[in-house]
Amino acid sequence: MASLKKRAKEFETPYPVTKAITKGDAVTKLSMFVMGLGNLAHKQIVKGILFLAVEIAYLLFMIEGGINNLYHLITLGGRAQEEVWNEAKGIYEYTGGDMTILFLLYGVATIFITVLFFMIWRVNMKSAYEVECRAKEGKHINTIKEDLEALVDKRLHWTLLTLPILGIVIFTILPLVFMICMAFTSYSKVGDHLTIFHWVGLKNFSTVLGMGNSIGKTFWSVLGWTLIWAVLATFLNYILGMILAIVINRKTTRIKGFWRFCFMLSATIPQFVSLLLMRTMLKDNGLINNLLVQAGLISSPLPFLTNATWARATVVIINLWVGIPFTMMQVTGILQNIPGELYEAARVDGAGPVTIFFKITLPYMLFVTTPYLITTFTGNINNFNVIYLLTAGAPVPVGATAGKTDLLVTWLYKLTVDLQYFNVGAVVGILTFVILAVVSLITYRNTGSYKNEEGFQ
């Protein structure tokens, strides 16, 4: 708690909004309602006009459509498209109905615009209180030229970060909030709610997390396989890649560059190409089964992609072929940076190769690569390419929404793109994020990389 208070003090400003409201003069307090008034009163004309222009623009936006957007965000509309007979033309015509998805989008966007306005309003209050205090103390009040010069000097970070942050808000945070809102609606092909839908509260979460329906049972089944897949894909790649790197890195190994080149060949081929090619080769009538049959090793094709157990084993093995070269190269770089003095001291003390590995090499590797392991684990939970391109989630039981090799991310794709269960898909997306965030944060905070940031000991 003390550390949090200390960090909070670092962000304190000498001109907070609370003091501007409680201790400011009449002009500063009026700036709450007429933005820029405090700046105008102290001859910061351009700055005051800009604040006032922002307020006028926001008020016009709210009058023209913002208030209506917020109202429709609550109601989500309800007027469906109607079929009306046109006597003159002798045909049926359709009257325009409500597009609920647009009401939801515009409502969320209006909230974001309102939050942005409130942030600018806070800057306005701080600025008004600052110029008031500086005027009372007889200090210099900046001109617009000095403020602009500060944007490329003392406040350069504002200039550089404004556009990236704005881009993140518009293209990342806004769609995420929109998706989260969708999870609380009936937006789905079920019941013909693709055009007109309404708020349903936590019903979708109950559907996904409950065991009394097909969606709920599928979720827990897919979640279990996703976690098993992530653990196997992460640690098998890591362990085998490390062993391969250690073997190649030994002093007795010759032509090391050649062996590294051979193992990196699979990484140079685009995954899209190699996985689709492997999928074709592993089919019942594919190259591998044909070769095995012709060699007399099997009498019937092996169900690489049609049997649940075989398919799961296949994707894990193929993922090793794809992922081990990357791990090998990462580990190779780290191995070459382990201080040689540690090994020399261990040998002097009589330690053998196994002891050196478990006492020096492995602890050092884990210390350096734990963040990489966590990132790889989360990446494997969201590993869309390997699963979808290799098996497309197959085999799929009759009537099921997910196959035996589907991960949460591939199931989410099917729910939204193929089945148009957008509300359920949004819930799955939220739950996936929560699982990843909790596992990653708890794991990282309990690692040596976090607790001993000063270095390996």
Predicted features and spans:
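Transmembrane-helix bundle segments that line or gate the permeation/cavity pathway
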Residues: 43, 54, 65-81, 112
